[in-house]
Design a protein with these regions (language model features):
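SAM-dependent transferase fold signal centered on methyltransferase-like domains
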Residues: 1-347
Length: 347
């Protein structure tokens, strides 16, 4: 369905949005409105999505149109989309194989000469075309097609590609997959289509994806980014360089806190490190790795770098007698007292 989104510039629409911005969406859908000059349900979708976008997309929240109610759920957040875009800095032409709401394409376009953005849903591409025009972005070409089909028909070379494949299996709406090899579009089909005309591809994946298994499934992976926001792991990024070469990838653990990105990088092969155990006592510091470090399984690597000892076997808590600087990728506490589990101490 090709949708005309010009109604969002209608003063009556803006008045509707303003008047009902805090009203429950279900209540609005049941309420009768006579002689509206726009689609009521689509307008209510805008209200719902704008509410959620205020935190997720603060720059764009009220400047774009949302084609469906899941648009805001599935899109990249502003902070992570800007990070994605930086990975393409200096590229001439980038292809976004899974456009969605177009947030990644929007920010990538600011770092590159041109972007081709593909999506199979016509209502989605209609919305993205409207948004790009309204935002003054003229170096993004939005195409309504399936990624595999487009790549079969168009043989143009690209500097790089970006893909955020769907994690839901197509034959079972109640089944969810976290393995990249099982997602849609099928990366196993995409790679042969682009590897001869592209320098690299960035693949976005669920934070639940198994990093070791993914590297095993796609030996051409050269870099991995584990991205957290305020100590909550949000997503994984995998870079595959072309031509593909099998080597140990670099793992970047990043946590975005306030306006700072706390990063720790290591080689995938470095994971086998032994850390001594110790006993806590007052005056020491207690170290808790952040979510990206935990997802990477790099807690002992970090401990080794910072000269820490482990609280106990199978523990991910660490100790030090020396006050460290603020570069530690996690939380740091001062130990003021150590209590046993005896009844007097517990009381």
């Amino acid at each position: 369905m090709c949708e005309d989104f010009s109604f969002v510039d209608n003063p009556e629409f803006e008045l509707f949005i303003s008047q009902y911005s805090t009203t429950d969406a279900s209540t609005l859908r049941l309420k009768r409105f006579d002689n509206l000059k726009f689609d009521k349900n689509l307008a209510i979708t805008q209200i719902e999505c704008r509410r959620k976008a205020k935190k997720k997309l603060p720059e764009l929240a009220e400047k774009i149109v949302y084609p469906t109610d899941v648009s805001i759920e599935q899109c990249s957040s502003e902070i992570l989309a800007k990070f994605h875009a930086n990975l393409f800095a200096g590229c001439d032409a980038v292809i976004d194989l899974t456009c969605g709401l177009g947030i990644d394409s929007f920010y990538i376009a600011q770092q590159t000469k041109s972007v081709v953005s593909i999506d199979a849903a016509e209502i989605v591409t209609s919305a993205v075309k409207h948004n790009m025009h309204k935002l003054g972005i003229n170096n993004v070409s939005v195409v309504n097609d399936f990624a595999e089909s487009y790549l079969d028909k168009v043989k143009n070379p690209f500097s790089a590609a970006f893909i955020d494949p769907s994690r839901r299996l197509t034959d079972d709406r109640n089944s969810r997959t976290y393995a990249i090899k099982d997602t849609v579009p099928d990366l196993n089909l995409i790679i042969p289509q682009i590897e001869s005309r592209c320098n690299f591809i960035i693949v976005k994946a669920s934070p639940m994806a198994d990093i070791s298994q993914t590297i095993s499934d796609f030996p051409g992976i050269t870099e991995v980014w584990i991205l957290s926001v305020k100590n909550e792991c949000k997503e994984l990024l995998f870079k595959i360089d072309f031509p593909q070469t099998a080597k140990q990838p670099q793992i970047h653990c990043i946590d975005f806190v306030a306006n700072e990105a706390i990063e720790f990088t290591f080689k995938f092969e470095d994971k086998s490190i032994s850390i001594a155990d110790g006993t806590p006592h007052p005056g020491q510091q207690l170290f808790v790795p952040n979510a990206s470090i935990m997802k990477a399984g790099a807690y002992d690597i970090v401990a080794d770098k910072f000269g820490l000892i482990r609280l106990a076997a199978n523990s991910h808590l660490y100790l030090s007698d020396i006050t460290t600087n603020h570069e530690y990728p996690g939380r740091v506490f001062s130990i003021t007292n150590v209590l046993s589990l005896s009844k007097p101490d517990i009381k």
